[in-house]
Amino acid sequence: MENAVFVSEFFNLGDELERLGVFDAVINTDSPFFINVLRLKQTTVPELSHSYEKINAFFSDIMRLLCASQEKGDRMYREALRRFDFSGVNGINLGFSESGVDAGFGRILSQKVIGDAYDIVKAGSTQPEIFQLVGLFEENVAADRLSDMIATLIKEDIINYTRRINEQLSLNESTYPQITFV
């Protein structure tokens, strides 16, 4: 991470992020870290305390659609595929993107994952957590893409957390008028 600029450096925060237990992200490139869904299950961060349930609720809906599907390509299957739309979430700066734009899941990879999920459902499993294991049964799906998927589902929670931390640190348009804050 040559020439990496950390949030703490950019805003001259000293050790405030560490004191608050906040990740000191690199702002000009991705940090090689990922969202760990199992940590979300146990988090005490208020804004993220329901994120794990939100993720499972989303995938439970996908599983219900696949259960109701009679064959690959029918209406219920297509609806599951339509909902399984995960472009990368820009701005959280996690993963391995060199361009700063996260890849997420493309159409072909989404079709493959939903096709495999359909086969798993038809074999008898309807647990939404199966999507947390997608990297084990699908090529080209590693922690980076899984993290993008999770970030897409909990984006609002991440934004709310960021707003609270920004408020605690007085990071806003008043103190930094040259920056647009979310």
Task: Cite the ranges covered by each PLM segment.
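Long, contiguous, compositionally biased segments that the model treats as domain-scale units
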Residues: 2-172
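Conserved nucleotidyltransferase catalytic core and NTase-mimicking acidic/glycine-rich helix/loop elements
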Residues: 177
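Interfaces and regulatory segments of ATP-dependent nucleotide/adenylate/phosphodiester-chemistry enzymes
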Residues: 182
